[in-house]
Regions:
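Sequence contexts marking disulfide-bonded cysteines in secreted/extracellular proteins
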Residues: 24-26, 49-51, 121-127, 165-167
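Surface-exposed, polar helix/loop patches in the mature regions of secreted/periplasmic/lumenal proteins
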Residues: 79-150
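Glycine-rich, aromatic-bearing surface loops/beta-hairpins
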Residues: 135-173
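Early exported N-terminus immediately downstream of N-terminal targeting peptides
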Residues: 32-82
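Sec-dependent signal peptide recognition
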Residues: 2-10
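Boundary at the C-terminal end of the N-terminal hydrophobic targeting segment
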Residues: 17-21
């Protein structure tokens, strides 16, 4: 079974994998900042994408806007680190080039559009279940979980992640 959380977040950064330089990698805190910044856009995009196919009583439809608003608080705080991470993998000083508000908006649009392209309506019930299970988690824990799942999902495969994460030493060694 596909890791639907991975699909939902890997979502969203279709152009990042293409633009990323082979030697650029993100540390876990950088990856977590980027994911934290993307979470509200992911939830909003999934809510929009899945509203036509899910019952109104589902967690995503009922709670999606509230979850996105809750995640937005932390996303705003994560922006400076997310910007650095985005610049690192894109090889651009994006916010300086296009301006801070435009950079934020463009990244949010890329995330939402990328997700909408990748998620099929038949995936919506799976994403709804994930949201229902994980919605109590704080944003930081969600970002840590997502980046850890991304590392696991791409570690031994030929999959191309939306961004490369630097390998980290095993704790306790």
């Amino acid at each position: 079974m596909k890791n639907w959380l991975f699909v939902a977040v890997v979502f969203a950064m279709p152009g990042l994998a293409i633009a990323q330089g082979a030697k650029s990698c993100l540390t876990p805190p950088e990856a977590e900042a980027l994911v934290t910044y993307a979470l509200p856009s992911v939830i909003r995009a999934m809510t929009t994408r899945c509203t036509p196919v899910l019952p109104a009583t589902t967690a995503l439809i009922q709670s999606g806007p509230v979850i996105a608003a809750r995640y937005q608080v932390d996303a705003d705080k994560a922006w400076p680190a997310a910007r650095v991470a985005f610049d690192k993998i894109s090889g651009l000083d994006f916010a300086t080039t296009v301006g801070e508000p435009a950079a934020k908006g463009l990244i949010e649009v890329l995330v939402g559009a990328g997700l909408s392209e990748k998620v099929k309506p038949t995936d919506c019930p799976k994403f709804d279940r994930i949201v229902d299970i994980l919605q109590p988690l704080p944003t930081k824990n969600m970002a840590m979980l997502i980046t850890t799942l991304m590392a696991i999902d791409t570690a031994d495969r030929q999959k191309k992640p939306p961004f490369k994460m630097c390998s980290t030493p095993v704790s306790g060694e």
